[in-house]
Amino acid sequence: MARSIKKGPFVDGHLMKKVETEGPNSKKIIKTWSRRSTITPEFIGVSLAVHNGKKFIPVFVTENMVGHKLGEFSPTRTFHGHAADKKSKVKK
């Protein structure tokens, strides 16, 4: 179920303050654990480091990302490939 339009997008207050003080063209990377925050137009041009549970993944916000959540750009799980077929290994 989508979020109600009358509520508006959710952005953590502490993250919004940091983005406003740093400005869009700042070289400084802002670290955040707030994966649930929605990217708004104020975030365009800002470099963020989004935590994935283990480390911080660098994310540079562009216009195409507006409306998405920060967590979408820092995957929490790594895919190492499917297990090989044991039968084919034994026959060789």
Swiss-Prot record:
Gene Ontology molecular function, alphabetical:
rRNA binding; structural constituent of ribosome
Cystine pairs: none
The cross-references to InterPro entries, in alphabetical order and at most eight, read: Ribosomal_uS19, Ribosomal_uS19_bac-type, Ribosomal_uS19_CS, Ribosomal_uS19_SF
Cellular component terms per the entry's GO annotation: cytoplasm; small ribosomal subunit
Q: Which Gene3D superfamilies match?
A: 30s Ribosomal Protein S19, Chain A
Give UniProt keywords alphabetically.
Ribonucleoprotein, Ribosomal protein, RNA-binding, rRNA-binding
GO process annotations (BP): ribosomal small subunit assembly; translation
Q: Which Pfam families match?
A: Ribosomal_S19
Q: Which PANTHER family match?
A: RIBOSOMAL PROTEIN S19P FAMILY MEMBER, SMALL RIBOSOMAL SUBUNIT PROTEIN US19M
The role this protein plays is:
Protein S19 forms a complex with S13 that binds strongly to the 16S ribosomal RNA.
The record's similarity note reads: Belongs to the universal ribosomal protein uS19 family.
Under what name is this protein listed?
Answer: Small ribosomal subunit protein uS19
Name the gene behind this protein: rpsS
